[in-house]
Amino acid sequence: MDRSGQAGNTIIVVWSDHGFHLGEKEHIEKFALWEKANHVPLIIVDPRKPKSAGRVCSSPVDLTCLYPTLLDLCGLPAYPANDGLSVASQVSDPSRTIAKPALMTYGFGNHAVRTQRWRYIRYADGTEELYDHKNDPNEWNNLAGEKQYKKIIEEHAEWMPKTNAKPFENLR
């Protein structure tokens, strides 16, 4: 890009898949709402923001942020139908707080909400999981059944989708 003269005005975005589980939580596929199945790298480099170069934003985001963020960084109007929010302010200053938690969905009615500390999962059958990433980064201890976490569950449940899209036919 340096030779083309475009390095100074090209935003670079790199993200990746997470690969398969290799037996974690007795699971060998990648179709799950746990951290290992959803934590993927995301790198956004804006050459106009040199102060943030090489800095890491530790707040979880989901990939619905990509399109709104690129619109924002390019100075284009936001598209109101987008589910995601721009994280352009975190590209400029990675220490800034993200306005909403990351949301993941797998299958019909199965969702997870990930905040800095917690992952809350609610399945279509009503079962729940809650993990404290400060004390349990591998998500071995489901806290959802413990009364002292009721408020945390309620706060995270507010971010769950209110409606579900019809599933694709024959989707595994």
Predicted regions and their residues:
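An amphipathic, aromatic/His-enriched active-site/gating alpha helix that lines ligand/cofactor pockets
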Residues: 146, 150-153
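Residue-level signal for alpha-helix termini/capping positions
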Residues: 2, 6, 92-95, 148
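Active-site rim elements
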Residues: 29, 50-61, 73-78, 140-146
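C-terminal cap/loop subdomain of S1 sulfatases and analogous C-terminal strand-loop tails that border
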Residues: 18-27, 62-67, 71-133, 138, ...
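Histidine-centered active-site microenvironments of extracellular/periplasmic hydrolases
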Residues: 2-55, 99
